[in-house]
Design a protein with these regions (language model features):
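N-terminal pro-sequences and low-complexity stem/linker regions of secreted or lumenal proteins
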Residues: 65-474
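Short, solvent-exposed loop/turn segments at conserved positions within beta-propeller repeat blades
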Residues: 13-14, 21-24, 30-34, 43-48
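Beta-propeller blade signature
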Residues: 45-57
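Structural signal for beta-propeller blades
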Residues: 11-12, 52
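Short consensus segments that form the blades of beta-propeller domains
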Residues: 16-18, 39-46, 97-99, 134-135, ...
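Extracellular (secreted or membrane-anchored) zinc-dependent metallopeptidases
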Residues: 50, 61-65
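Conserved beta-propeller blade signature
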Residues: 2-4
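Residue-level signature of beta-propeller blades and closely related beta-rich strand-turn architectures
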Residues: 8-10, 58
Length: 474
C-alpha cells in the first residue's frame, strides 16, 4: 500500500467569512495567522483539510490511467491551444517559444492581498458578490476604469496562499518544498521564519526566478522594490538590475511617491533608449494597516495604491513605447479578504496597446497563466511544470495596437485620513507589526478591517472551487 499525506487536502473553498482589513474586531498582521480556540475563521491558511490516502501500489496500467486523469484535469491542453484566436497577422502572443512578438516591453506590477469580491464585485458584467465589497469604484476608480476599458478578469486565481509563498509563486512559478511546509508554522505562530522573497536561501526556487530566466535568455530586466529589502536586493541576480532609490515594502511611504520615483527612473532610461524588456514594480500599500491609531485608514491606503496604479498606466499610455508595451497587474496572494467563489480568486489586470478593449474574459487563469504569457512575449521557455501547463492569456489580446487616452483619476477620498476611533479593535491594531507584509494574524487583521468599514454587519464563509466554469447564463 501507498500512504499519501496531503497537507492541502482536495480543494480550496470560498470564504465569505474571510478576513477583512476594515473589520473593527480584527487585527491586521504581517506574516502571522495564529487563531484562538473556537474561532470560526475562514482564513485561507485554515481552509485546507489535510488528507491521508491509502492506495494499492499502482501497476503500469494504473499509472497510464492516473496520468490521463491528471492531464484531463489540467486547464491547459493542446486542443485549447488550437482554439486560440491567434491566426490574425501580427497577433502579439506567440503560440510557441522563440516566435517574435511586436510587444517589446513587459511591466509586471505586484500588489498585496486583495480578493476579487473586495474590489471589483460592483462591476455588473463580472461574477461578483457585492455584499463582500469593501473597496469599490469610489475607492478604486482607476482599477475599475482599467478593468472596464481593457479586460475584466473575473475568474483569476492566485496560486499561493500567503505572501511567504506568494512572491515566490509570482516570480518563480512555484514555492519550494521547504517554503510550502514551513509557512503554516511561521504564520501560525508556532516557530519558524518568513523565508520568502529571497529572505532565506533554502526557500529560494532551485533554478531561480523569472529574472534568472531573463538572464539565461538574454532579456534585459529591472526590479523596482520586488525582492528588495532595506534598499538591497535579496538575490544576487538583481545586483545592478534594481532601482536603488525605489522604496521596498514600507507602509509609511505612499505608493504615489513610489510612482514618482519609478517615473523619474523610467524617463531617464527612455531618454537613453535603455528601458529594460522586463520590469517588475511593487505597489503594496493595498495591504493596509487596519485601524492602527494615527495611521492611514484602510480606505486611504487602498485609494493611494489605486492612484499609483492609475498614474503608472497614464505614464505608459502617454509614452512613445505604449504600442510595444504590455502591463500585467496582480496580487501576490488573496489572503486578506473574502470571496464568494474561492479564497484564491483575486483581482488581475492587463493593459497595453495590443490588449482588447471593453472585453470580459471568464477564462480560468492563475498566477502562472500570467507568467506563461509574459514568457511567451519575451521568447523564454517556462520555468516550471506549473507555468508550462498554465493557460496563456491569449484571449486578452488583439492583433492591432491602439492608443489609450487616459489621465489618472485623482482619489475621491482623503488619502491622508488617519484612524482616530479608539476602541478594542484599534487597540489590537497597535500591537501589530507592519514592518514586513504578513507579519500579523491575518484573520484578526481582516476582522478589524471588516468591522472598521462595515460596522456591525456580520463578518462574511468558505467556498471550494478549483476553477469556475461559467455557463451561458452567467
Amino acid at each position: 500500500k501507498l500512504w499519501v499525506a496531503n497537507g492541502k487536502g482536495f480543494s480550496s473553498k470560498a470564504n465569505p467569512f474571510g478576513p477583512s482589513p476594515v473589520r473593527a474586531k480584527e487585527e491586521v498582521i504581517s506574516h502571522g495567522a495564529s487563531f484562538k480556540p473556537g474561532d470560526q475563521v475562514e482564513y485561507i491558511g485554515g481552509l485546507f483539510k489535510g488528507s491521508m490516502s491509502i492506495i494499492p501500489v499502482p501497476t503500469d496500467k494504473d499509472l497510464v490511467a492516473y496520468s490521463k486523469a491528471v492531464y484531463k484535469n489540467v486547464p491547459y491542453s493542446i486542443a485549447k491551444t488550437n482554439l486560440a484566436d491567434s491566426s490574425a497577422p501580427g497577433f502579439p502572443i506567440p503560440m510557441k517559444q522563440n516566435q517574435s512578438s511586436p510587444i517589446k516591453y513587459v511591466f509586471y506590477v505586484i500588489k498585496e492581498n486583495r480578493t476579487y469580491d473586495q474590489v471589483l464585485s460592483d462591476i455588473p458584467q463580472g461574477n461578483g458578490d457585492t455584499s463582500l465589497l469593501l473597496f469599490g469604484k469610489n475607492i478604486t476608480p482607476n482599477q475599475h476604469h482599467i478593468a472596464e476599458s481593457f479586460v475584466l478578469l473575473d475568474n483569476f486565481y492566485v496560486d499561493a496562499e500567503v505572501s511567504a509563498d506568494g512572491h515566490n509563486w509570482s516570480m518563480g512559478g512555484y514555492a519550494n518544498d521547504y517554503l510550502e511546509k514551513t509557512w503554516p508554522s511561521s504564520y501560525g505562530g508556532r516557530g519558524g521564519t518568513y523565508g520568502g522573497e529571497g529572505q532565506r536561501e533554502i526557500a529560494n526556487n532551485k533554478n531561480g526566478f523569472i529574472w534568472n530566466q531573463c538572464y539565461r535568455n538574454g532579456v534585459s530586466y529591472r526590479s523596482y522594490g520586488e525582492f528588495v529589502s532595506a534598499g538591497r536586493p535579496t538575490l544576487s541576480i538583481l545586483k545592478d538590475h534594481y532601482s536603488t532609490k525605489y522604496p521596498s515594502y514600507n507602509l509609511a511611504i505612499t505608493d504615489a511617491y513610489r510612482f514618482q520615483v519609478w517615473k523619474k527612473d523610467f524617463d531617464s532610461l527612455l531618454a537613453l533608449n535603455k528601458v529594460p524588456q522586463f520590469n517588475t514594480v511593487r505597489f503594496g500599500n493595498d495591504h493596509t494597516e487596519g485601524l492602527r491609531l494615527g495611521r492611514p485608514t484602510p480606505y486611504a491606503h487602498v485609494a493611494d495604491n489605486d492612484y499609483a496604479v492609475g498614474l503608472f498606466i497614464e505614464a505608459l499610455a502617454k509614452s512613445p513605447i505604449w504600442n510595444e508595451t504590455a502591463v500585467f497587474i496582480l496580487e501576490d496572494d488573496a489572503q486578506n479578504g473574502s470571496d464568494h467563489v474561492d479564497a484564491h480568486r483575486s483581482t488581475a489586470y492587463v493593459a497595453g496597446g495590443f490588449v482588447k478593449r471593453n472585453f470580459v474574459d471568464h477564462t480560468p487563469y492563475t498566477t502562472t497563466s500570467m507568467l506563461r504569457t509574459m514568457e511567451l512575449i519575451l521568447g523564454m521557455p517556462p520555468m516550471t511544470q506549473y507555468d508550462a501547463a498554465a493557460t496563456p492569456m491569449w484571449k486578452c489580446f488583439d492583433s492591432t495596437a491602439k492608443p489609450f487616452v487616459f489621465s489618472a483619476i485623482a482619489p475621491k477620498i482623503n488619502t491622508k485620513e488617519v484612524n482616530t476611533v479608539r476602541n478594542e479593535w484599534q487597540q489590537k491594531s497597535e500591537k501589530l507589526n507592519f514592518v514586513m507584509e504578513d507579519s500579523n494574524n491575518d484573520y484578526e487583521f481582516n476582522k478589524i478591517l471588516w468591522h472598521g468599514l462595515k460596522g456591525n454587519i456580520p463578518y462574511p464563509a468558505p467556498r471550494r472551487a478549483a476553477f469556475v466554469t461559467p455557463t451561458e447564463k452567467d
